[in-house]
């Protein structure tokens, strides 16, 4: 029976301490709120004392015009268009291992011949 009473007393004491803590927190919050209200009241009193001043409505800010569009550049992901070969030029077979040749190579016998000049 003695342990039940001591448990009950300790429970009541802990609840009382908890109640004191909560009430102190509420009092602190009320004091902060009251201080904010006092500041607002002082601001209103100052603005009422300056009634002789003319009211200037806030000016509207006009957004700047949009920048001119940038010239369209071909993106790096798309290759440049292939030049069109005329029907007189022979079509060349392009291998994936060799560089792409757009025109047929010059004929070698004439270029390397020492007697061509």
Swiss-Prot record:
Origin superkingdom: Eukaryota
Task performed by this protein: Brassicaceae-specific phytocytokine (plant endogenous peptide released into the apoplast) perceived by MIK2 in a BAK1/SERK3 and SERK4 coreceptors-dependent manner, that modulates various physiological and antimicrobial processes including growth prevention and reactive oxygen species (ROS) response regulation.
Residue numbers spanned by region Disordered: 42-117
Species of provenance: Arabidopsis thaliana (Mouse-ear cress)
One Gene Ontology term from the biological process aspect of the record: response to herbivore
Gene Ontology molecular function: LRR domain binding; receptor serine/threonine kinase binding
Keyword check for Secreted: yes
Disulfide bridges in this chain: none
Quaternary organization: Interacts with MIK2 (via extracellular leucine-rich repeat domain); this interaction triggers the formation of complex between MIK2 and the BAK1/SERK3 and SERK4 coreceptors, and subsequent BAK1 activation by phosphorylation.
GO CC terms, sorted: apoplast; plasma membrane
Motif (SCOOP motif): 41-55
Amino acid composition bias (Basic residues), ranges on this chain: 42-51
Position of the signal peptide: 1-31
Biased segments, Pro residues type: 60-84
Localization of this protein: Cell membrane; Secreted, Extracellular space, Apoplast
Protein keywords: Apoplast, Cell membrane, Cleavage on pair of basic residues, Membrane, Secreted, Signal
Extent of motif SxS motif essential for MIK2 binding: 47-49
Induction: Accumulates upon infection by generalist herbivores such as Spodoptera littoralis. Induced by wounding.
Name this polypeptide is given: Serine rich endogenous peptide 5
């Amino acid at each position: 029976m003695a342990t039940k009473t001591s448990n009950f007393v300790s429970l009541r004491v802990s609840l009382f301490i908890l109640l004191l803590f909560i009430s102190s927190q509420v009092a602190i919050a009320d004091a902060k709120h009251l201080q904010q209200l006092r500041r607002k009241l002082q601001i209103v009193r100052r603005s009422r004392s300056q009634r002789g001043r003319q009211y200037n409505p806030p000016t509207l800010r006009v957004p700047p015009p949009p920048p001119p569009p940038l010239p369209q550049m071909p993106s790096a992901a798309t290759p440049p268009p292939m030049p069109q070969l005329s029907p007189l030029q022979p079509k060349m077979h392009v291998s994936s291992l060799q560089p792409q040749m757009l025109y047929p190579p010059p004929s070698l016998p004439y270029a390397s011949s020492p007697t061509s000049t």
